[in-house]
């Protein structure tokens, strides 16, 4: 029920935004959508005007090369954010904003696109409805597992990594976690400074010529390592070597 409610709310906000933008003179191209709108600007409004107004309100939008604008709604979008988006386009069009005071359930999906069958019917998804119940269930699973806290474990690039609570805590803070991967570069200067400083420190500690922080998993790290080894072999004329001995 919770997942359905979240999905319905996301779609309803997108539908409300589409309705408001149409009243302001903007065209929405996606005939069927769940959370994403594609807006065509009228001749009286330019992309640069929208961008300037949006940035002044600390809002980033997707600006396509053809001049269209993309907007995606998610579960964090609230009434304040919805009205801010509407105000941006209203200001650019020289019209009064349309205030949305409540989020009513309004579906623009055709019946053919709505799911009729049940989903997530396994008892695991149906028996735990509170945070306490879920935490106890996860703890029960944890007790069945073997970890570094109990004994030696087999080699694993993911399981060998340990993040202390002090390291994970900052990741839950808004200044670190609320960043979109496609944010303009000038809005991510702090991240670039963190990445640069950490890379330089690791280079000094290890003596490596360079360090990459891009791999985000053990598998990605192993692949990156193999690529480095491959590049080294090619640099010394041994690019024909293509066999890897992996310890069991």
PLM feature segments, named:
Residues 1-15, 187, 237-238:
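Structural signature of PLP-dependent enzymes
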Residues 1-2, 29-33, 114-115, 172-186, ...:
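Gly-rich Lys/Arg/Thr-decorated short loops/hinges at beta-loop-alpha junctions or inter-strand turns
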Residues 11, 24-53, 73-76:
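Conserved PLP-binding catalytic core of the aspartate aminotransferase-like
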Residues 29-36, 63-70, 216:
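Short Gly/Ser/Thr- and Asp/Glu-enriched loop/turn motifs at secondary-structure junctions
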Residues 79-154, 158-166, 171-177:
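Flexible inter-domain linker/hinge segments
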Residues 130, 176-216, 221:
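Conserved N-terminal alpha-helix of the aminotransferase class I/II PLP-enzyme fold
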Residues 232-248:
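Conserved PLP-anchoring active-site segment centered on the Schiff-base-forming lysine
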